[in-house]
Amino acid sequence: MYVTMMMTDQIPLELPPLLNGEVAMMPHLVNGDAAQQVILVQVNPGETFTIRAEDGTLQCIQGPAEVPMMSPNGSIPPIHVPPGYISQVIEDSTGVRRVVVTPQSPECYPPSYPSAMSPTHHLPPYLTHHPHFIHNSHTAYYPPVTGPGDMPPQFFPQHHLPHTIYGEQEIIPFYGMSTYITREDQYSKPPHKKLKDRQIDRQNRLNSPPSSIYKSSCTTVYNGYGKGHSGGSGGGGSGSGPGIKKTERRARSSPKSNDSDLQEYELEVKRVQDILSGIEKPQVSNIQARAVVLSWAPPVGLSCGPHSGLSFPYSYEVALSDKGRDGKYKIIYSGEELECNLKDLRPATDYHVRVYAMYNSVKGSCSEPVSFTTHSCAPECPFPPKLAHRSKSSLTLQWKAPIDNGSKITNYLLEWDEGKRNSGFRQCFFGSQKHCKLTKLCPAMGYTFRLAARNDIGTSGYSQEVVCYTLGNIPQMPSAPRLVRAGITWVTLQWSKPEGCSPEEVITYTLEIQEDENDNLFHPKYTGEDLTCTVKNLKRSTQYKFRLTASNTEGKSCPSEVLVCTTSPDRPGPPTRPLVKGPVTSHGFSVKWDPPKDNGGSEILKYLLEITDGNSEANQWEVAYSGSATEYTFTHLKPGTLYKLRACCISTGGHSQCSESLPVRTLSIAPGQCRPPRVLGRPKHKEVHLEWDVPASESGCEVSEYSVEMTEPEDVASEVYHGPELECTVGNLLPGTVYRFRVRALNDGGYGPYSDVSEITTAAGPPGQCKAPCISCTPDGCVLVGWESPDSSGADISEYRLEWGEDEESLELIYHGTDTRFEIRDLLPAAQYCCRLQAFNQAGAGPYSELVLCQTPASAPDPVSTLCVLEEEPLDAYPDSPSACLVLNWEEPCNNGSEILAYTIDLGDTSITVGNTTMHVMKDLLPETTYRIRIQAINEIGAGPFSQFIKAKTRPLPPLPPRLECAAAGPQSLKLKWGDSNSKTHAAEDIVYTLQLEDRNKRFISIYRGPSHTYKVQRLTEFTCYSFRIQAASEAGEGPFSETYTFSTTKSVPPTIKAPRVTQLEGNSCEILWETVPSMKGDPVNYILQVLVGRESEYKQVYKGEEATFQISGLQTNTDYRFRVCACRRCLDTSQELSGAFSPSAAFVLQRSEVMLTGDMGSLDDPKMKSMMPTDEQFAAIIVLGFATLSILFAFILQYFLMK
C-alpha cells in the first residue's frame, strides 16, 4: 500500500527539521514484526513531511524523500498536520488509499480526485517558479506504478505549465523522488560547477521573487551553492533564531510585490554574509611534530532557536598555508564540526591557518590567520651507506646526512651482522662522522650493514640493508659435475665446492651445456649458489656435455672438465600396420611392415609378428615370427581362411604397443585349363578380335579374371589382356604377321594353366613410317636428299613422295617415284628449309616421316641498294670542315647467312675500307669538287657486288670575316657597319653575319645574327668602351671570328627644359624663371637664355650662367617678346660644352595697366595675346595634322580606284 502526501501550497511548518535531510527511522519501523504493513509516504520536492516519534518528539522531513511507516492494523498512521491544513484520505476503485494534505480553503477542497492530484493545481505564484517544479512541459507526470493498487494514470491530467525562467535548472520528477542533494554534496561541487550555479542564481534572483519571504522549504541558490530550507531555518514560531527574517505567509503572491520582495531577500542574504564574515580565528592546541588540533567558535548572531534542535547548523572550511601569512592556502577540511585534527605535517615547520563559515549556502569571508610551528622530532630514516673502498680485510663506508627535522644530528649508529647471515645486527660504529672503516675482516666475505641517525630528540629508523663484500681470490677450477640420475628429458647433476674456499664464502656456480655436436660453444643453463641442478627440456637418448665454472666478487674461475652424459631412451611407438606383400595363395602369403615413426631414441632390437584365425575364441594371439626383419612369409595355412595379423617391436627403451590388425583370407584352388582362343570375324592388318570359353572347374569357384598372352614373331611373349570379359581386341599389330595367342583363368585360388596356342595371321596393310631422310649440301649450292625403304607391311612399296618447303605450312610435293634419292637446286643461301617423306603400296599410304630441317650454306652479301650523301647533317656534328668532307649513308644489304665484316668505298682513283657501319665521313676532299662513289659489302665468304655509282659534290670554303667599323656613336648607342652592302657577290652567296659583344666576364655573347651590314647597339652606358667581333657564315659553313674591335659611346647632352615662366616686375623689367637640371656624371650644367623681339627672325642670347633665373630691364610696352632657354653641359675632362635642345618659347607683352603672364603656349587671357603668333609646338602639331589629313585622303582615293 502507498500513501502519497500531496501538498497544494507551501506549509510554513514551525517544527525542527532533521539534520542534513536524513530520514529518522522510528524504532517500531525497524523492529516491527512481519505481519505489519509498510506504508510508503512520498514527499515531493519542495515539501516538508512531519511525523511524531515514539518519544513524542516531532521530526521534519524535507522532500524529495520516501518515508516508510509501519501500520500494525493496516490503517493510516497518525500524521501531524499544521494549523490551517487538513489531511484527506481518498480511496480509489482499486482500494488504494492515499492521503492528501490541503489547506482549509473552499477552492482547495477539490470536488474531483484528479483536480486534487494535479501538480500545479491551486499553487501560489512562488511555487510555480520554484526550481523543483518542471515548467513548460507537455508530459503528464504520474506516481510510480508498482502494483495493482496504484492510482490509474487518468487521474493525473496533463497540464501545460507556464514558461520557466530558469535557464539551466535540473529537471527533477514530482513523484518517486528518493535521492536529493544533501548539504555535503552541495559543498563538494567543483569550482566550475559553482561558478555556473552562481550565474544561474543571478538570473533567478533578477527574474523571480525570492521564495524565502514565504517561509517555504524551497531550495535557494546563492554564492554557487544550492540548499533546501528546513522548516526552522526560515524562522521558527518563537522568532528567536538569527536566521532569515520571518514574514507573514500570504495565500497568494502579487506581481507588484516582486521588486520589494527581491530587495528584502538580498538584504537578508547580505546580513547573513556579514555575520558569517565575523568568525574568530581558530585556536591551535596539542601541537606535535606531525599533527595539531584546530578548534573554532561559530559566528555570533546566527544561533538557532529553541525549536530547531540544532546547535551549529553551519559548515566550515579550513585553509592551510606553509608559504607564509600571504602565501597560497589549500582547503584541508570541509564539514560541520568545530574541531579538526591536522595530520601528516612536516616537523619544525611554520604554518598559517584560517577558517571560513557557511550557512544555508552563503559563505563568509575568511577569519584572521593564526600561525603555529610544529615540534621537532627524530631525524628521517637515512639512505643506506655506500661502499667507498674495500680490501681483503677492510671495508670503508660513507653516508649522507638525512633530514634532521629541526634538531641537529649528533651521532650515527652503524650496525652489521659480522658476516653471519640471519644472525642479528650488532653495533660497529657510533659517532658524528659520516664514514667508517672496518678492519680485520675475512677475504671474500659479505657483510650486511644498516644505518640510523640520532639527534637530541631521538633516533631515526634504520635504513635499508646493504651487503658489501671484501676482496678475495678468484675461485680455483672446480671439479667436473657428477651425474646423479638421467631421465628421458632431464638429467640431475651435482658438484662440490672448489678447493681453497671457506665455508662462509659465497660462490656462484654457472653450469654450461653443449647441445649440438657441430657447435663447440657452451651455453649457460644454470646460475646460482646451489650444489645441484636438474636440467630439463632435453632431447631423449641424446648425448650432452656439461662443464662448471665458479665465480665470486673477484672474478670467474676456469671451466671444469667436461662431463658427457646421455639421456635415457623412450619406449618406441608401434610399427605400421602389416601389409600383404605379393599375391595371397591358398596355403600362404607374405606380409611386411615398416619400423615405427618414433623409435624412442634407440635402435629397434626385434619385431614380434602375431597371428590369429577367425575361428579362435577370445582372439588368442600367437607369435608367428620374432626377429629383426620387417617381412615374413606364411606357409601351410588353410585355404579360404580369414587370419588377423599385428606387429610390435622391442628396444632398450621398452616394449611398444601393438599395431592395428590386418585381416587376410587365403585363396581357394585355381581354375582348370581354358580352350584355345579363336578369331571373331576376319583379322585386320593392325588388330584381331579374340574370344574364348569359360574353363571347367572342379572346385566350383567363379573365375574373376582372364589373362591373354601373345607371342610375337621374335618369340617375345607379353600379356595383351587382363579382365573378366570372355573376348578382347588386340591392337597395334603388324600387317601380314603371324601371332600366337593363349589364355588362362584366375580366381581366389590363383591362375589356372594356359590353354593351347592359336596361330593367327594379320592382313596386309599400308607401309610403315619412313625414317627421317638424310640431307647433304653440294659445293655448287644444291641439296641432295636420300632415304631408306620402310617396312612394307606385307605388300611391296609402289611409290615415294617427297615434300619440300620453308616451313611446315608451305610444304609442296617436289618428287614422287621409286628412287631413294633426289637432288634439289635453285635454293636461297643461308635459308631454312624442311622436308618429309611418305611411302605407298597397294594397301594404301603410310604415315609421314618426321619433319627434317635443313639450312643452306651462306654466300657473299648482296649489293648495297641505297647509297646517299647526307646534305642536312649539322655542321657541328663533325669537327672537319664541310668543304673537305662528305657524309655517306647507306642501308645494310642482306648478308646471306654470314655477318658483314666491312665495306669498300670506291672513289674512282682510291678505295677506302670501313668497318661494319652504315655511315662514314669522307675526309681530306677538295672543296667544291664532284666525286663518283660506289660501295660493296664483305663477309667471311667474300665480297659482294658493287652498288651503282652516285655523284656528290663538296661544299665551297666558308667566307672570311668583314672589317667592323663604327658608323655613328651616341651616348647610349653605337651604330656599327661592316662589309660592302652593294656587292653582288655577297648578295649571291646569301651570307649571314654574327655580331658578338664582350661582357664584363670577358665572354662574348651574340647580339645580332642576320644578313644586314649594319646594326645599332642600344641601352649602352655613356662615355664607355665596348669590344666587338664579327663572323660570316654561308652555305659552306661558318667562317672564323674577326679580331676584336673597340668603340666608345659619347657623352649625353642635357635634356630639354620646359618653357620658362616670365613675371613682370616694377618698371620696364621682367624676371624669367626656368627649371634646373642636376649635374650629369659630375659635370656642371650652365644655362643659355635667348630672346626674340617683335618681328625679328633670329633669337639673341641675353644670358649664360649657372643660375636658373634672370631679370631683363628696359623693355618696351606693347611689344612681343619670346624667351627660350637651353641647358649646356660643361665636360670637365675634355673642356667641351654639350648644349641641349632649346625649350619651347614663352611669350610676354609688357603693358602699363595689367600684365598677363604665361608659361604655356598661347595661354594668356588678353584678346591681343590670343592673336599672337603660335609657338613652335603649335606649328609642329599643325604640320603633323595636315600630313595625316592628306594621307587619309590619298588612301581613300587609292582605294576608290583599286575597287573600281
Swiss-Prot record:
Transmembrane segments: 1182-1202
Fibronectin type-III domain ranges (all copies): 278-377, 381-473, 477-570, 574-669, 673-765, 766-859, 871-957, 958-1052, 1056-1153
Sequence segments annotated as region (Disordered): 185-215, 228-262
Keyword hit for Hydrolase: no
Subcellular location(s) of the protein: Membrane
Sample GO molecular function, one term: RNA binding
A single cellular component GO annotation: membrane
Tissues of expression: Predominantly expressed in white adipose tissue (WAT) especially in the stromal vascular cells. Expressed in adipocyte differentiable 3T3-L1 cells but not in the non-adipogenic cell line NIH-3T3. Expression increased in the early stage of adipogenesis.
Compositional bias annotation for Gly residues: 228-242
Domain of life: Eukaryota
Protein name: Fibronectin type III domain-containing protein 3B
Lineage: Eukaryota, Metazoa, Chordata, Craniata, Vertebrata
